[in-house]
Amino acid sequence: MDRTEQKSIIEGLLFVSGDEGISPEQIAKVLEIEGNEVIDILEEMQKECEGAHRGLQIVQYAKVYRFATKKEHASYYQKLIDIPTAASLSQAALETLAIVAYRQPITRTEMEEIRGVKTDKALQTLVSHLLIKEMGRAEGPGRPILYGTTKEFLDTFGLKTLDDLPPLSEENEQMNEADLFFGSLQEISK
């Protein structure tokens, strides 16, 4: 087996060993080579990963090697963590989001009439996750705020435009819009 293939296998071993890492001795047993040769290969791989074109580095902790992300990219990893997902939203927020998606622009009062309960907390959550925003004000007493979905909403749910929302058929209009919306999203993502 040549050096390139050995590096490829070691790279895979580092990946599957995860945060626990893997010792040079374990790698040597898998590849059936000497431990000193494994250390030489790991050192070569560490140098190769140091370049700016690589997002991972190979680090050694407590006699094991493992992959780690580069510290200089930490702000990007934090952005990923901060991206809202449907899983991080409560059922109330998801139901409210479905109502906004299908009925926008819509006021808080209209949402509460559809849901039958207050939507203040759900609206706060959706606005803070940048999934909905104020679209303007409705005409009429008090000029209530109108809400609509955002580009982040489309990105989060893998939609190009609002036209990609599954249509509501007449028989389904009696069903819960949130159930229809998220059931349809599951179909889209298959």
Curated annotation (Swiss-Prot):
The keyword Transferase does not apply. Pfam families: SMC_ScpB. InterPro entries: ScpB_csome_segregation, WH-like_DNA-bd_sf, WH_DNA-bd_sf. It comes from the Bacteria. GO terms for cellular component: cytoplasm. Keywords: Cell cycle, Cell division, Chromosome partition, Cytoplasm. Coiled coil: none annotated. One of its GO terms (biological process) is chromosome separation. It is found in: Cytoplasm. Participates in chromosomal partition during cell division. May act via the formation of a condensin-like complex containing Smc and ScpA that pull DNA away from mid-cell into both cell halves. PANTHER family: SEGREGATION AND CONDENSATION PROTEIN B (PTHR34298:SF2). Homodimer. Homodimerization may be required to stabilize the binding of ScpA to the Smc head domains. Component of a cohesin-like complex composed of ScpA, ScpB and the Smc homodimer, in which ScpA and ScpB bind to the head domain of Smc. The presence of the three proteins is required for the association of the complex with DNA. Belongs to the ScpB family. This is Segregation and condensation protein B. The gene is scpB.
